[in-house]
Amino acid sequence: MTAWLGASYVLPILLVSFVQTNAKPEKTKMDCYKDVKGTIYEYEALTLNGNERIQFKQYPRKHVLFVNVATYCGLTAQYPELNSLQEELKPLGLVVLGFPCNQFGKQGPGENSEILPGLKYVRPGRGYVPNFQLFEKGDVNGEKEQKVFTFLKLSCPHPSEVLGSFRHISWDPVKVHDIRWNFEKFLVGPDGVPVLRWFHRTPISTVKEDILVYLKQLKMK
């Protein structure tokens, strides 16, 4: 009996070790599928202050970067870097769009009206103000996910095979293309079709380099 109990404890440990050892490392990015049907121009979203419903068809011939953001996350430091990215690549047609979400570690709590003060005075703080458009807070996974994120996720494979810890998954249903954490990014081309998807921990400097390579390749076509 004692031997059986010992084996029952050891087996799960061995299985966990096997899974961790054999898990493939995350890629920093993935190319989106070549046969995507539809464009972002079919979708819209309400601005953070609730005053305007923006149709994404107002971004024709622009390179649009969709980012699901959160205020109280270890990656919130990417906010100022996104400002720099917007400023530096705006002359090349880049538009950054931010979508606050509270689905990952409950790191985007509060009302829409609390988001900008939280960014300005808490994280990243020091008077920070985003220079790109933020939209109202909403889900990016699950039954109530925003339709544009349904489209983006189905258009691009995820850079990681790991869904993450079940204690962080609060939505249903769970799908393989789901966003894993705050600050994942999708780049949409000038025709409204998604082209690239980045893992959330990919540095903004790498995202910038990837976008510049993409723009150079696009120019050569």
Swiss-Prot record:
Enzymatic reactions: 2 glutathione + H2O2 = glutathione disulfide + 2 H2O
Tissue: Epididymis.
Pfam families according to UniProt: GSHPx
Alphabetical UniProt keywords: Oxidoreductase, Peroxidase, Secreted, Signal
Record-linked InterPro entries: Glutathione_peroxidase, GPX_AS, GPX_CS, Thioredoxin-like_sf
One Gene Ontology term from the biological process aspect of the record: response to oxidative stress
Protein biosynthesis listed as a keyword: no
Superkingdom in the source lineage: Eukaryota
Disulfide bonds: none
Subcellular location: Secreted
EC number assigned by the record: 1.11.1.9
Active-site positions on this chain: C73
Gene Ontology annotations for the cellular component aspect, listed alphabetically: extracellular region
GO MF, one annotated term: glutathione peroxidase activity
Cleavable signal peptide: 1-21
PANTHER family (alphabetical): EPIDIDYMAL SECRETORY GLUTATHIONE PEROXIDASE (PTHR11592:SF127), GLUTATHIONE PEROXIDASE (PTHR11592)
Function: Protects cells and enzymes from oxidative damage, by catalyzing the reduction of hydrogen peroxide, lipid peroxides and organic hydroperoxide, by glutathione. May constitute a glutathione peroxidase-like protective system against peroxide damage in sperm membrane lipids.
Protein name from the UniProt record: Epididymal secretory glutathione peroxidase
Organism of derivation: Canis lupus familiaris (Dog)
Phylogenetic lineage: Eukaryota, Metazoa, Chordata, Craniata, Vertebrata
